[in-house]
């Protein structure tokens, strides 16, 4: 493989274009040019060409990975699955995840806390938050730590607000039953729901 021309890209800063003898183009970084000692007229052996192609692929995956993780926080498991869907080899996906963890961009413990806080603000209970952490691939050993930040008074306020919104002053047993069922689906336990119903003015028997 012979590099016929090596020139800077007009569209992407710090990107270089290597035009090969067959007319194909390699998009390179400055580091790759230095690492492989590339210049116009340079002939690469098959082994060098393979290593260069692999280096380009690796850097492209890493650049895309950085954009993905800074745009949308994800768990490590979610992130690895997403990379694999982009045809990134599983071993390479794990390597990139390790790299992002070292940089501090991928942190399952912090992500678990964010998810717990988000769903608490949305008015969901602990059971629902656990389901969400499971769905997002957060390791189970991180769940309790994330849920510790949820205060009982926060749950109570969220349930009270939900009942006020749904019932709007109604004490009709059918309306109350529907609201109670909805709270259960949101992940609240019966003791929490019954306490809220008492605060609302309903007689409740456990």
Where do the model's predicted regions map?
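An alpha-helical, amphipathic repeat domain used for nucleic-acid recognition
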Residues: 1-206
